[in-house]
UniProtKB/Swiss-Prot annotation:
Family per similarity comment: Belongs to the herpesviridae immediate early glycoprotein family.
Keyword Glycoprotein in record: yes
Membrane topology: Single-pass membrane protein
Gene name per UniProt: U18
UniProt name for this protein: Putative immediate early glycoprotein
Species this protein is from: Human herpesvirus 6A (strain Uganda-1102)
Length: 293
């Protein structure tokens, strides 16, 4: 048997420690800017054990990657909460909660439903797993107000709480089906942080949780607020809704540009055809005159 060198031994100890010490944090900040059209700037920044693992547009978070890693956890496999038991329902739940708290969707929902005058809003999700404890904390920041849900081996949370007066009734929305939030924080997210840390250790050079996006500004549709009028928390589990529907997508912009381009192209072609016809008639008259007809 080959002897372990000090370097390989250090790597071995480091990798073995992965399963026992992991800390995963993602921060989202959304800012609304009223220019000639309303724009939304949403930035997501993620850290794995304090090391940057992505910083770009919220819509560029690798949700499918996070969902696939979360599906590896025992918490996901054993999930039986809120009448969610089938694989398809549990997968839909992961898709929804990751979009809510890792891609800024919940921030847009709160602005549309409870905080119409908000120009900016931010949130943080932090999960950890070590030898002594496991758990997670979700925190929303609005002005000087902080709203928190903390669930771990030391704290058995039952509701979101605010250190302010909650004059806008934000807690009414957040505490809907709060058992799903608590289950994710206490049973899935800590193990997810461990899975993420393993991937970070295996591929330190290329690992990232967010795709690069040089254009974090997104145009919001004129109807984006009204689209949330009939929304309630976790509605998307049963109704497969598009989380990007608040934004004008590239295909629509491309289509409108293409339509305009086709209009001008058709107009130009018609003008050229008209000129050719006129030139042909003038040339024909000269030929007839020269022949003496």
């Amino acid at each position: 048997m080959k002897k372990l060198t000090m370097e390989s031994l250090s790597v071995y100890i480091f990798v073995m420690g992965v399963c026992f010490t992991s800390n995963f944090t993602c921060e989202q900040k959304i800012v609304l800017i009223q220019e000639h059209k309303l724009r939304s700037i949403c930035i997501s920044t993620c850290y794995v054990n304090g090391v940057l693992a992505g910083n770009s547009s919220c819509v560029s978070v690798k949700t499918s990657y996070l969902i696939n890693l979360a599906m590896l956890t025992n918490g996901f496999k054993a999930m039986r909460v809120g009448n969610i038991t089938s694989i398809s329902e549990k997968t839909a739940f992961l898709r929804v909660i990751i979009n809510y708290y890792f891609r800024g969707v919940m921030l847009r929902a709160l602005i549309a439903q409870r905080l119409p005058n908000a120009a900016n809003l931010s949130s943080t999700v932090n999960c950890w797993l070590d030898d002594h404890s496991a758990g997670g904390v979700m925190t929303l920041f609005y002005g000087t107000e902080r709203i928190v849900l903390n669930s771990s081996t030391e704290i058995n949370a039952s509701r979101w709480i605010s250190d302010g007066q909650d004059a806008n009734g934000t807690l009414n929305i957040l505490n809907e089906r709060v058992s799903l939030d608590i289950y994710f924080l206490s049973k899935i997210c800590p193990q997810l942080s461990s899975e993420i840390y393993k991937k970070k250790v295996a591929h330190p050079k290329y690992f990232s949780l967010i795709k690069n996006d040089t254009k974090p500004k997104k145009f919001l549709r004129n109807t984006w607020r009204s689209a949330w009028s009939n929304w309630y928390k976790y509605k998307e589990i049963k109704e497969f809704l598009d989380f990007s529907s608040d934004y004008e997508n590239f295909s629509e912009i491309t289509y409108s540009m293409s339509a305009a381009g086709l209009f001008f192209l058709a107009g130009g072609a018609f003008t050229m055809l008209l000129l050719l016809c006129c030139l042909s008639m003038i040339t024909r008259k000269h030929i007839v005159k020269d022949l003496g007809y």
